Amino acid sequence: MASSILPPEGEALATGWEPDLAPADSLVRQAVLAHASWATDAARRAGKPWYDGDSWAGSVLGDSGPMTNWVIQKQPVDPAEVILDAARQLPNNVPYLFVSPWPTRDLREHGLALAGHPPLMVHLPTTEIVPPATDIDIRQVTDAAGLAEAERVLIEGYPLPELQPFRSGCMYDASFLEGSTVWVGYDGDVPLATSTAHSAAGVTIVENVAVMPAARGRGAGAAITWAATKHHDQPAVLIASDNGQPVYQRLGYLRLERWTVWVRP
């Protein structure tokens, strides 16, 4: 009886990670491919080094901190092979985040340090909640001045000490808005919160969520995340930090699985 469920001999069986497989094969695949787009889009538009192949994608925007540079696996291959290939394809003297949608072996021998196993979370467009309330004014960024304010909030509010003191252009080139949408939350004219949405592979990546101390406890984090989440009528995904998870869960986000994040210092 067991043989009745076996496919015909020689039939090609999809694993879900073939390069030519449609993104919509699974929600996790969409999330992986969308993060690969996120990892390369800003650098590609800014004329900085980037690479997007079958098994991994990555780029180098700067040399001051790992959050500016991403390498993400697109297939369940040996991560050591990806690290070695990244050293050939990209500048090899900069810090970066190494993101794997799968568990990895110990990569310390390759100069990486384990950052953790954060959950990939998803928000489905059919999820109904009451939009979060805040006294912060949420505005979509449309110009260079607004982008610089978003960048400052991200660096000082997240915070990213390796990019301090703040220098405009470390994270966001002027071309960034051509591929992503950014919001800033203001109290009067003071920028206090920010988020970004990047659409690819049929999902929205919600990234770069940060809130300054003066806006915490005022619903700013939830409201600025909600703006990015609902920007496109499609599923939204994000890699959640420890501090962000409770906020995202209240917005209707669900945990899908844990990913693995290493840092090249």
Where are these regions (language model features)?
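N-terminal charged segments
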Residues: 1-91
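A short helix-loop-beta-strand connector motif used in the catalytic cores of GNAT acetyltransferases and
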Residues: 43-53, 92-96, 101, 115-118, ...
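Conserved acetyl-CoA binding element of GNAT-fold acetyltransferases
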Residues: 66-75, 202-213
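Acyl-donor-binding surface of acyltransferase catalytic domains
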Residues: 74-142, 238-240, 244, 259-264
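Conserved acetyl-CoA-binding loop-helix of GNAT-fold acetyltransferases
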Residues: 79-86, 208-231, 250
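Conserved active-site tyrosine of GNAT-family acetyltransferases
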Residues: 107, 248, 253
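A short, well-structured alpha-helix characteristic of acyl/acetyltransferase catalytic modules
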Residues: 144-156
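A conserved beta-strand-loop-helix scaffold within acyl/acetyltransferase catalytic domains
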Residues: 162-210
